[in-house]
Amino acid sequence: MKKPIMWVAALLTASCTPALKVEVANTTPTERDDETVEIAWSEVAALKGVTPDNIVVLNDDNEQIPSQVLFRGGTEPQALIFQTDADPMESKRFKLVTGQRENYPAEAFGRTVPERYDDYAWENNKVAYRLYG
């Protein structure tokens, strides 16, 4: 059973402004770090001229934050994700706009282990895994 950790409301105001406004609320009494926020691409597509290559997420200070478009194995975008921290009972606002996306350093790494053609290893800043074939 999934517990609702973060609540997301996309305020579809694209027809009024060149941005979509998103409010993310932590409705729990627990601090949330690096919580992933997912917005269906069908909601993002309400933004005029948006493509997977030009969607940008801005915080309240108009600073661009890393985001990623999910395709889930297909050729059409399915969702937009980004991460944020949230204190207990805190709400944050973000804007989705079109623009030039910044390049961000990779935070995860994966590779096929050359010593064994059927092994795979991957890691990020919190965990590391190795799959033995």
Question: What does each model-identified segment do?
Answer:
Residues 117-133:
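Acidic-aromatic substrate-binding/catalytic surfaces of carbohydrate-active enzymes
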Residues 8-9, 132:
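A ubiquitous, low-specificity "background" feature that marks scattered single residues
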